[in-house]
Amino acid sequence: MDFAPYLLKYEALSRAADQVFERVKQAFPDCVRCREECADCCYALFDLTLIEALYINEKFKAKFSGEERDVMLEKANRADRTIHKLKRKAYRDLKAGKPEGEILTALGDERVRCPLLNDQDLCDLYEHRPITCRLYGIPTSIGGKGRTCSLSAFENGKSYPTVDIDKIHGRLQEISVELL
């Protein structure tokens, strides 16, 4: 199957996310504190859609080989095992009657190092990183709840342009479904 048309749609969405980030950064330069070697976002837990996983896999296979690839895959396996345990605990908590909001908040507080983060705290696939990573330092909304990077200077109670992550995930899901 030729994934190229779907990957192009994903790349267009990624570029749009980059443009939104830059507009917010230009409008609020004192609030957006993203900089090279700041890896706070590289420990956040989030899911990838099918199209994002395919895109990252394609770029990963094109860039890495041999021992370097093996080392990165081992880091990915370790992160995956940690995340699996966290998800399993979240499922048990849900079945035990813990409110879903509390579970999601607890998961949001967890920190797992991204396997693409190198020893210099730089992303080895930065140009091809997921959309969530591209938007992390600006105000976002997930399920109607506003979120910001803890290192940013956006103030609670003030109004800022906010990216609706649910809409972006909806578009990512649409592209992913087109693949099937």
Task: Please place each PLM-identified region on the residue numbering.
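Short loop/turn segments that flank or connect secondary-structure elements
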Residues: 1-180
